[in-house]
Amino acid sequence: MVKPHRSSAARTRITRTLAALAMIVAVNVAVIGCSNDNSEGLVDGVSDKYPLHTNITATTFWVGEILDPTASDGSQVLSTYDSRWYESYGGCDGYIDEGGVCQTEARKASNGYFPLNMTPLENPFYLDLPYDDINNEIGFADRDRVIPWAGEKPYSDHVGDDRFSYMKNRWVAITRGDVTCYGQIQDAGPAEYSDADYVFGTDDRRPLNKKWRSAGLDVSPAINSCLGFPKLDYIEPVDWRFVDDADVPDGPWTEIITTSQVQ
């Protein structure tokens, strides 16, 4: 069977159609490429917008703990951002022993690492970092210069406002091994309160603090158990970085989100 011969006009239409299709494909590829180039990256599922701090010693603390009754910063009945932290949280983040002392307790994945003997009113996934932007004179004076999100709303609406913290309630991703858990900042420490080079630096600076194996953050019992620390009230190396609200995945840490400000 002899195939019919296509006219030159038909061949021209086919050629133009193929060229147009090729151009559409090329444009789509270019658009996708530009989108990827301009989007934030992910490192182990965590946004890399903020620098990663590696191999930082974390200690465990909890609402109601009395670490040193003689020290101005030795009690977790209050925090630098909440003078009624114990009340705001709902009580001892653990249990009261026979001597009336607030103790920590092992947490279980089956209930999202929540406390077993009380019902928290605020997020049990909390931590501190050594930058106090409210009660430390240097921390407050420098916060608009050193805190990366200071120019964003709602923070930019509170310049000079000592009743509004840029640090309180900010999210942090904390990684130990292949496990990442999230928590909100609710206090400042350990031991240092204006260590901007470590907290906000981009060169993986070591903390100024030399106590507790140069600890660079305290984490709550919920974060301790979520990360699989070997023991309660333990010291363990972790990696951490700040995370924007929109980049926090659902998990037990989003069951209760703390929104209260300085009080």
For each feature predicted by the language model, list its residue ranges:
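N-terminal secretory signal peptides that target proteins for export/translocation
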Residues: 1-13
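Bacterial N-terminal signal peptides
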Residues: 19-30
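Secreted/periplasmic proteins
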Residues: 39-263
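N-terminal cationic leader/targeting segments used for protein routing and processing
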Residues: 4-6, 29, 37-39
